[in-house]
């Protein structure tokens, strides 16, 4: 995962998975969330957080034993609705003017298709990775709770 210090008390790592995988080079991939949860139904009250990082699976296709599937997970056949609900839940648990950092790799699905799933407009973003396929996108929840047009 991308946390500098996963033991930092200000960080809460949530994932639907709780598993361990042996990779082909002998390394172990541990997915051990602080809270095992589904991003479509986040088990926290409205306004609980000032900052949320939303890093959902971005793959629709991956081999059953591939390390990409093990590391990043895979989207369901209902991925548009899943991500729509995920965005909604992230904004629900954010406080007023809370920040949402969204990470997406568009190797299989374009970021424009994903951004169409939320009424909230991003403030800014950054492309990274070897082919600039990974997008880091920043949103801020509006104070009045209104949704952008």
Language-model-detected regions and their locations in the chain:
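Class I S-adenosyl-L-methionine-dependent methyltransferase catalytic core
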Residues: 1-149
């Amino acid at each position: 995962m991308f946390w500098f210090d996963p033991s930092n008390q200000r960080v809460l790592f949530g994932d639907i998975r709780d598993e361990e995988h042996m990779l082909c080079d002998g390394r172990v991939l541990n997915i051990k969330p602080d809270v095992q949860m589904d991003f479509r139904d986040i088990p926290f009250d409205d306004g609980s957080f000032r900052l949320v990082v939303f890093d959902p699976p971005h793959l629709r296709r991956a081999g059953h034993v591939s390390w990409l599937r093990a590391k990043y997970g895979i989207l369901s056949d209902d991925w548009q609705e899943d991500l729509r609900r995920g965005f909604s839940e992230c904004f629900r648990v954010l406080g007023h003017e809370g920040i949402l950092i969204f990470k997406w790799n568009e190797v299989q699905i374009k970021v424009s298709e994903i951004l169409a799933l939320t009424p909230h407009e991003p403030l800014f973003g950054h492309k990274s990775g070897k082919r600039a396929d990974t997008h880091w996108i920043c949103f801020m929840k509006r104070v009045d709770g209104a949704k952008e047009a």
